[in-house]
A protein has these predicted regions:
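Conserved glycine-rich Rossmann-like NAD(P)H-binding loop of the short-chain dehydrogenase/reductase
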Residues: 31-48
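Active-site helix of classical SDR
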Residues: 124, 160
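Conserved glycine-rich cofactor-binding loop
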Residues: 17-18
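Substrate-binding pocket helix/loop in short-chain dehydrogenase/reductase
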Residues: 100-113
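SDR active-site lid
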Residues: 174-238
Length: 296
């Protein structure tokens, strides 16, 4: 039996098989400690583990259905059996769907709540008390600039990211002077498979905002977390988007975001009967071209 004092601290990356989570795992590996990658994809986990080892870290992988009711317990048992304790929890798993809420499958939309909200909350609340008792460690939660505004045509995704932001910022305040940090990461569009899977790549909004690499986001996320930051918004364009969302009233933002969330092949909301990209979307495309070279 391993005594509590003999447990080694580990960075646990939920959704570590790809995207931002995988990039954060690679950055964390530089500290040459244990990195535990948790996801459903065995191929992605194997590739991410190889990157962690190349970076100097010790990699462990766990295939886990994150929305299963016993996921936190199974993860803790996995750690305990290897003499590890969750010192840093990175919640980067999530997904979204694009389309009118009334047209998308109900099960798919409820799945967004299950993964983006319920699973993240359950894992966070499961591991935080141990961190507080040890007076060290913390949680890095992945939100998005989408969490600053309501998002017509990706209503549940935007709402879920708003939950993550408010939940994380509240915990950050609650845990001051405990030695534990909770940081919210809110990037703009990132060049990962998420854009294709969710359909977000089709929208004018995600095409106007410049995309950044997950490695860029990971570097700034880890640096911000290590320095105890409450909120990290990587990149000037993402910061400008977050600022605009904070300053403009919802009455102005909602119609704007709704139009920008349209895909090029969607019917134009003006009622012309034309495709959006051939009608009102043309003006947004011209705006995007005009912004190139101005917004990095």
């Amino acid at each position: 039996m391993i005594s509590h004092r003999e447990f080694r601290p580990a960075v646990v990356v939920i959704g570590g098989s790809g995207g931002i989570g995988r990039a954060i795992a690679s950055v964390a590996a530089r500290e040459r400690g244990a990195v535990v990658l948790v996801a459903r994809s065995p191929e992605g986990l194997a590739a991410a583990a190889a990157e962690v080892r190349e970076g100097g870290g010790e990699a462990f992988t766990l295939e886990l259905d994150l929305v299963a009711g016993d996921a936190p317990t199974r993860l803790e048992d996995f750690l305990s059996a290897r003499g590890l304790v969750c010192d840093v929890l990175v919640n980067s798993a999530g997904y979204g769907l694009r389309g009118a809420a009334t047209a998308l499958p109900i099960d798919g939309q409820l799945g967004i709540i299950d993964l983006n909200i319920h699973s993240l909350t359950e894992l966070t609340l499961h591991f935080l008390p141990g961190m507080v008792a040890r007076r060290r460690g913390g949680v890095l939660n992945l939100s998005s600039v989408a969490g600053f505004v309501p998002g017509p045509y990706m209503a549940l995704y935007f709402a879920s990211k708003g939950f993550v932001r408010f939940f994380s910022e509240a915990l950050h305040q609650e845990l001051r002077r405990t030695g534990v940090t909770v940081t919210c990461l809110a990037p703009g569009p990132v060049s990962t498979e998420f854009l294709a899977r969710s359909g977000a790549y089709q929208t004018v909004l995600f095409n106007i905002l410049p995309k950044v690499d997950p490695e860029y986001v990971a570097e700034r996320a880890w640096r911000g977390f290590k320095s105890g930051r409450r909120l990290v918004v990587p990149g000037i364009s993402a910061k400008l988007a977050a600022l605009a969302a904070a300053l403009l009233p919802s009455a102005a933002m909602l119609p704007l975001v709704g139009r920008l969330q349209r895909g090029g092949n969607d019917p134009c909301p003006c009622g012309s009967g034309m495709k959006f990209k051939k009608c009102c979307g043309t003006r947004q495309i011209q705006l995007r071209r005009g912004l190139r070279g101005i917004i990095p």
